[in-house]
Amino acid sequence: MSQIACPQCLATNRVPEDKPAEKARCGSCKAALFDRHPVEADEKSFDTLVNRTDIPVVVDFWAPWCGPCRMMAPAYEQAAAHLEPDVRLLKVDTQANPGLAARFGIRSIPTLAVFKDGKEVTRQAGAMPGPQLLRWIESVTAYA
């Protein structure tokens, strides 16, 4: 049984291993737990989305004024469509959430960080094209 935090209401849900996770719904708010899009996280939701989820979580620390961030956004969106429900992808706007950027020592954007069991396991700074981004996420989450 996997534990997944609902991206809508942040309730913790248990998803049976023998059921298709992509069809799972939140027991509290009935929202889909996965919609094949990155989840926007903020200072209120970040810890719940990372710590109450058994699957690897990839976080894109970005800013709206960052050209490379905007260029990588469609590839990150496609990666979410390809990788969910095996990997949860989050986006954190560092301009709107400077506390999270400071907490994780984000010095350049975009920066991708991978978390497993609430702990950061690796990170990568800089934008990547779609195929490279997908390969990197698959390679680092395979062992997370």
What are these regions (language model features)?
Residues N13, L33, A73:
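Cys/His-rich microdomains that often coordinate metals
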Residues D54, F61-W65, S108:
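Short pre-active-site segment immediately N-terminal to redox-active cysteine/selenocysteine motifs
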Residues P38-V57:
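A short beta-strand-turn-helix
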Residues F61-A75:
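Conserved redox-active cysteine motifs that mediate thiol-disulfide chemistry
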Residues C6-C9, C26-C29:
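Short cysteine-rich clusters marking metal-coordination/redox-active sites
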Residues A41, F61, Y76-G99, I106:
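Thiol-based oxidoreductase modules, predominantly thioredoxin-like and allied folds used
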Residues V15-A24:
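Short linker/helix segments within small regulatory modules
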Residues S108, A113-A144:
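Non-catalytic, surface beta->alpha helical segment in thiol-disulfide oxidoreductase systems
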